[in-house]
Structures are given as structure tokens and as C-alpha cells.
Design a protein with these regions (language model features):
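Extreme N-terminal tail/first-helix region
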Residues: 1-20
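Active-site-adjacent structural patch at catalytic or cofactor/ligand-binding sites
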Residues: 57, 68-79, 84-94
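Short beta-strand segments
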Residues: 21-59, 74-75
């Protein structure tokens, strides 16, 4: 890619890029020689606490049930008017469905907007969901800049 170089997003640029919710790709670590399990998901982002929330479908036959305790990475990327942007977060998911109402975990959830994307052949009311949060061990963003003279 001639003429392009990457630089880090500032925290403010990262927060603006993530907004209060959108879509990205969540990847779960696996064992042995298996590739990571990657799924497109909706997310909500609470910038005040650098916390990302997910509402994941977990039907009985879901492989996610056996993977949610594994390390994860989460990626959001898209082209903006100012060029390409991406954010990568890593860490472990924490279930928040059973957290007390007054807990920081649930209070942060009320501040985000997790988009509803219907990708199933059944009505959403028939699908079990669990809510998780990610307080990233690492949260970085990059942006494209024009390096032409």
C-alpha cells in the first residue's frame, strides 16, 4: 500500500470511532491446532469505563457456551471520511446477567446501545441470550494517514 502509513488513534478518537455501539468481530481462543472461532456481533461501548458489552445468543447447541471463558479478541474496522480506522480489544468476557442492579457492570450496560441484528431463522424471542462485558487488557486503535508529500 504505497502512500499509506498507520498511526495510533488517541483515546478520544478511539471513543468517537466506537461510539456507543455498533458491530464487529469477536474471536474466541481454542485449543490445539484449531483456528480461533470468530463471529460477527453487535456491541455497546461505555467510554467512561473503557468497557465493551455484548449480547450473545447461546442456544443449547451453541459452541460459544464452551468458549466464553477463553481469551478473546474483538475487532471493529471500517472506512470513514478520514480514512480507515480500526480498534482491537483483548481480554476475557465477564457475564453480567446476574450482577446486582446497582453494580457498575449493569449501570454501564444502561449507557450503551447494542444494535439488534436479526440473523436467525427463528424470532429473537425464542433465542436465549446472555450479556457479557469486556474490560480489555489491551485496547488499541489505528488510523490511516496520507503520507504523500
Amino acid at each position: 500500500m504505497q502512500g499509506l502509513r498507520w498511526v495510533q488513534l488517541s483515546d478520544a478518537e478511539r471513543d468517537e470511532f466506537l461510539g456507543d455501539g455498533g458491530t464487529g468481530v469477536l474471536s474466541f481462543a481454542t485449543t490445539g491446532d484449531e483456528p480461533p472461532v470468530s463471529i460477527p456481533v453487535s456491541y455497546g461501548y461505555f467510554a467512561d469505563a473503557d468497557t465493551i458489552y455484548f449480547r450473545l445468543s447461546v442456544p443449547d447447541d451453541s459452541r460459544k457456551k464452551s468458549l466464553v471463558d477463553n481469551p478473546i479478541s474483538f475487532v471493529v474496522h471500517r472506512e470513514t471520511e478520514a480514512g480507515w480506522r480500526s480498534v482491537v480489544a483483548t481480554g476475557r468476557l465477564e457475564a453480567v446477567d446476574d450482577a446486582p442492579y446497582e453494580s457498575a457492570a449493569l449501570q454501564g450496560l444502561w449507557a450503551v446501545d447494542i444494535p439488534t441484528v436479526d440473523v436467525f431463522e427463528r424470532p429473537p424471542s425464542e433465542i436465549p441470550y446472555r450479556t457479557y462485558r469486556l474490560r480489555p487488557d489491551d485496547l488499541t486503535g489505528r488510523k490511516e494517514v496520507d503520507s504523500k508529500p
